[in-house]
A protein has these predicted regions:
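ATP-binding/phosphotransfer module of carbohydrate and carboxylate kinases, centering on a glycine-rich
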Residues: 1-66, 71-107, 113-130, 168, ...
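Short hydrophobic beta-strand segments that form the core of ligand-binding sensory/regulatory domains
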Residues: 83, 135, 206
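Structural motif
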Residues: 86, 137-140, 198
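Short, ordered coil/turn segments that flank beta-strands lining enzyme active or ligand-binding pockets
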Residues: 98-99, 143, 209-210
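Glycine-rich phosphate-binding loop and adjoining helix at the ATP-binding site
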Residues: 102-123, 127-187, 192, 230
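Glycine/GP-enriched mid-protein hinge/lid loop-to-helix segment characteristic of carbohydrate kinases
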Residues: 174-261
Length: 267
């Protein structure tokens, strides 16, 4: 029985993955996509429809008047993601549906960000029982959910925030560099791409190469602010000085030159 239940869970996951492109699918379409047997697909699709995870679209008639096969689509409101963008003095909180549409937004001012305060923010937001995943973006370098250095938020340095969140709330969690989270949203739509952010603490960047985010060995990729702008100062040092007496066009141009010579993105 345990093995049978495990196989069913695997097949269910495979079928759900066939909907992640948000296309309309008949049971025959799903059978072709997944290479599962039609009886297996039919039974699990019916269960998913009853559980409101997918929706059956209204019956349609073919051109000859005959009944067409029912089509199914993912219920975009079945599951929400709780997304936190953590900065030095505030936390932005988004709840998004499966179609990446904003359900709600909040900005919480905090003078001293810490893991405890992040957990409290999450606790107030997961009262919505549709939240099935948590994503936290941190400025700095993060590896496997462990924060090596949080830019301007020293209290988070060395914190295994991913594990702390999962252990407290038992919800699938991802903690990563904020720019890496941003670029991952374009993974399916674009080819090689570089995203650049110019902030108070210096520039950051993230990349997709050959359709996949560049993660690096220890999460330090994209920290271009530590590169030298000239023989005396880094890009980050100039930012911390308030970009005084700096031609921003030249600043961005030099930054782009470093990125292009390494990544050579399409966009």
């Amino acid at each position: 029985m345990a093995f049978s239940s495990m196989v069913k869970d695997i097949n269910r996951k495979i079928i759900l993955e066939s909907f992640w492109d948000f296309s309309r699918n008949t049971k025959q379409d799903i059978t072709k996509k997944t290479e599962l047997s039609f009886p297996t697909v039919s039974k699990l699709v019916d269960e998913l429809n009853e559980q409101d995870i997918i929706h059956m679209l209204s019956d349609k008639r073919g051109e000859t008047g005959g009944r067409k096969a029912n089509e199914y689509i993912l219920n975009q409101e079945y599951a929400y993601s709780l997304c936190l963008k953590v900065e030095r003095e505030y936390i932005e909180v988004f709840i998004v549906d499966l179609y990446k549409q904003n359900i709600s937004y909040d900005k919480i001012e905090e003078k001293a960000i810490s893991a405890e305060k992040i957990l409290k923010v999450i606790e107030t937001k997961i009262l919505n029982n549709k939240i099935k995943s948590i994503v936290v973006g941190i400025p700095g370098f993060i590896h496997d959910g462990i924060i090596g250095m949080a830019d301007g938020i020293e209290a988070l340095n060395g914190c295994n925030l991913k594990t702390e969140i999962f252990q407290k709330f038992n919800i699938e969690t991802e903690v990563a560099n904020n720019m890496n989270i941003l670029v991952s949203g374009f993974q399916k739509e674009l080819g090689d791409i570089s995203c650049i952010h110019i902030g108070k603490n210096g520039p950051g960047s993230s990349y997709i190469v050959n359709g996949k985010p560049v993660s690096g060995a220890f999460g330090f990729q994209g920290e271009v602010g530590f590169n030298f702008y000239d023989e005396h100062r880094t890009f980050r040092e100039i930012a911390l000085e308030g970009y005084q007496n700096i031609d921003m066009i030249e600043y961005i141009g030099r930054l782009l030159l470093q990125i292009i010579t390494v990544i050579n993105p399409y966009k």
